[in-house]
Amino acid sequence: ITRKPQACPPIWLMRQAGRYHEHYQRLKEEHTFEELCKKPRLAAETAMGPINDFDFDVAILFSDILFPLEALGMDLSYNPGPQFGLHLDENNAESLLVNENPINFMEFQGEAIERTIERLPGDKSLIGFVGGPWTLIAYACNISKDSRNINLNNFQIGLLDNVILPLLKENIKLQLKAGAEIVMIFDSTAHQLAEEDLNFYLGKTFDALTKEFPNKVGYYAKDGINYETIIEKQNNPEISLAGLGVDSNIDLRDYFTKTSSGFVQGNFSEHFLTLPHEDFLPELDVFINQMLELDPEERAGWVCGLGHGVLKTTPQENPVSYTHLTLPTTVFV
């Protein structure tokens, strides 16, 4: 966050606790996904699996971005993916969004963070997360993932201002109070918005979710989003964004000079991580050699990770090699 030069970058991966990992698979034999998320003891055990097996620098709260929608009153289940009993529209919003104090529903996340931190070694920290406001609206309103150039309508702006942003602000506060070092906003469908609307939306989002928590909230978006728009916000000291996560479609090396503050997280391809081990290693070598073209001062602020989350088809030996070959200081000196 402070962009101090480091010979060895910190590393964490989105979905580092997940279906590719034998530890997670064993837990899923006895518990549902919702139990692993909502029972703090199990959430801590799930989050600690990749820390113990792969020695990542950071644990990630084990949870799901959609629980705030359930907290608001929407009927959410996982079979195995998320399903809603009904989706939001202008006609049913008042009958579906019924909970008066939705943040109370989210208390399990705070306890999960506390229990995970209790088990972490002293040299490791924990990252929390929330879903991006537009991503939650897209799920709630059943907006097709293929949609592009969306212009926000009055109903969506009302949801954003009066429902989603206030709850996410409380959710971030809850996670930070429980001990999260940083809370990431994972906004995986923000690229659906038209450019003018994206700028408007990001202004509202950062004004509501980052200014009260200076340098404590990071932002991630993907799939062709205009990162220049986000970087303009990141470089504004009044916004106090902790950092930016980028996908694998861009050259990460360009972004250290474009950003004047905060971290830049990414961006080895999660698809390369799914390759057979003998095919994965050359791709990792290319990535490491590209980053070695920058000295520690030039890549200050880098958090080593992926362009998105670890995929379920990832061979478990690949994350082991990723941490061992990427992290040793001898590689990056």
Predicted regions and their residues:
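Conserved small/polar residues in nucleotide/adenosyl-binding loops
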Residues: T323-T329
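Alpha-helix-loop-beta-strand connector modules within alpha/beta enzyme cores
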Residues: Q109-P121, L198-N215
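Active-site-proximal, glycine-rich beta->alpha crossover segments in alpha/beta enzymes
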Residues: S77-L174
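Glycine-rich, proline-tolerant flexible connector loops at the mouths of alpha/beta enzymes
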Residues: F62-M74, V183-D197
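N-terminal amphipathic alpha-helix/helix-capping segment at the start of soluble metabolic enzymes
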Residues: I1-P9, I113-R115
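Catalytic beta/alpha-barrel core
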Residues: K216-D223, S240-I250
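N-terminal small/glycine-rich loop or linker at the start of catalytic domains
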Residues: P5-E34, I65, L72-Y78, I127-G158, ...
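Conserved, mostly hydrophobic/aromatic
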Residues: P10, I51, T116, Q175, ...
